[in-house]
Amino acid sequence: MTERGLLIVLSGPSGVGKGTVREAVFKDPETSFDYSISMTTRLPREGEQDGVDYYFRSREVFEQAIKDGKMLEYAEYVGNYYGTPLEYVEEKLAAGVDIFLEIEVQGAMQVRKAMPEGIFIFLTPPDLSELKNRIIGRGTESMEVVEERMETAKKEIEMMASYDYAVVNDVVANAVQKIKGIVETEHLKTERVIHRYKKMLEGLQ
């Protein structure tokens, strides 16, 4: 029986740099995760590609997937749905592949209930003023939406205690190293190592 893969969930408030950190994690030659691409009803930002950054789908398609039980998690955020298709995640974990999710806080709490064995990492900004500057710096949001995102971010930061780890995204390279360290630590936990040796011993009988 194949050892089940790790589910690594990276989450945090809007504007904290989840996407940037995720991209850096996957560019690192020492990482070997599979990335579960999220589905969203929001419009693509400049440079984003369907099937690479997100699956960009209509509201009707997304709501049908919810009704059909095909979403591991989903949330409505600032008027748009975001969520994780279930089938891909289950298939990869069962095959022993580590899966990396980059999702919103609401969605992460749903995954926590569905798959409590996951590793939940909260990405934090150095401070709230820096977070606001990052959101404004995108140049894609009105000030009304910026303020709405900031109010949501304050509530989300209060939920940090529901996560296993917190990583400050001050310098992207530093955040990546910390995430790599967390995953390595989880792979070395005795319950996983014992399980591996039990299978080896069973094979000798």
From Swiss-Prot:
Catalytic activity: GMP + ATP = GDP + ADP
Sequence ranges assigned to domain Guanylate kinase-like in this UniProt record: 5-184
Record keywords: ATP-binding, Cytoplasm, Kinase, Nucleotide-binding, Transferase
GO molecular function, one term: guanylate kinase activity
A single cellular component GO annotation: cytosol
Presence of keyword Nucleotide-binding: yes
Keyword Kinase tagged: yes
Cellular compartments annotated: Cytoplasm
Record: residues binding ATP: 12-19
Broad enzyme group: transferase
Record-linked HAMAP family: Guanylate_kinase (MF_00328)
Role noted for this protein: Essential for recycling GMP and indirectly, cGMP.
PANTHER family according to UniProt: GUANYLATE KINASE, GUANYLATE KINASE-RELATED
Protein's recorded name: Guanylate kinase
Organism (species): Listeria monocytogenes serovar 1/2a (strain ATCC BAA-679 / EGD-e)
